[in-house]
């Protein structure tokens, strides 16, 4: 017999290291052709941080994305970015990139103000040009501005570093400000359980995430889809088998330690809940671990809803389902 159930999982997640210093830095240099090189140490492990930092720099400098060249993770030339963990890189390295861009823009604005006969604070940077905000017709292209910079013997370079505004936790009552910003999410999962074989199919998932202002919508959606899939494996497949006599792992290879494949991935609907004003770059928040976390309780709750049985461990393997069904029948 096959039974269906639905479950909900919600979470909040602090971005970055808990109350500990975890800074990151970035360098920016703008070249004579109006392109820019952005350098930072953060490792892109597939989540797309290199693309995100390029987009952040392009937005802050007012340049096309194609004009931004990124160098990351090269310890010979890039500044320290800290670990790619705790969903921290968008917030911390992203802000470092913005600060580096702003430092470079100070020299750019000084030179442009001299040429356009205005104060530096009257200028805006957009669409590969610098212009007077109140009179956009009075403008210079980046190429013209960089030529003026060269003639004046100036360089458009910047360095920025960012450390979240946190405090450590007081040992007597654990009070403090452990995180500068939090992400929130809720995931709903629908499953179908085969009571004879114990197999569980995840049919459909809806996952809504507070993302602040997304830097790249498609990458955020992909991050959520990846987290949902990892959560599915966490609950239903990824069982570490240990030899109790010697402590050795009995399934140490990917052929025996099973993770989801494309055929296992359910229908996933990602919902990006946007908000403004947060401390991240343009209000952005990280969606690394948050993409995974609520999927786990959602699937567990859906199985419990289908069977009417409580589970207190993961993974929930077919043998566990069959055992629970037999226990109900007694």
From Swiss-Prot:
Role description: Catalyzes the hydroxylation of nicotinate to 6-hydroxynicotinate. Also active against 2-pyrazinecarboxylic acid, but inactive against other nicotinate analogs.
User: What is the reaction catalyzed?
Assistant: nicotinate + NADP(+) + H2O = 6-hydroxynicotinate + NADPH + H(+)
Instruction: Give the protein's recorded name.
Output: Nicotinate dehydrogenase medium molybdopterin subunit
Indicate the family of this protein: Belongs to the xanthine dehydrogenase family.
| Record pathway | Cofactor degradation; nicotinate degradation; 6-hydroxynicotinate from nicotinate: step 1/1
What does the UniProt record note about how this protein's activity is regulated?
A: Reversibly inactivated by selenide and sulfide. Not inhibited by cyanide.
Q: How is the cofactor bound?
A: Binds 1 Se-Mo-molybdopterin cytosine dinucleotide (Se-Mo-MCD) cofactor per heterotetramer. The cofactor is bound between the NdhL and NdhM subunits.
Under the subunit heading, UniProt states: Heterooctamer of NDHM, NDHL, NDHS and NDHF. Dimer of heterotetramers.
- Catalytic site residues? 289 (proton acceptor)
Q: Does the keyword NADP apply?
A: yes
Q: Name one GO molecular function term.
A: iron ion binding
pH dependence of this protein's activity = Most stable at pH 8.0. Unstable at acidic pH values.
Q: Where are the transmembrane segments?
A: none
Q: Which UniProt keywords apply?
A: Metal-binding, Molybdenum, NADP, Oxidoreductase, Selenium
Signal peptide per UniProt: none
**Pfam families for the chain:** MoCoBD_2 (PF20256)
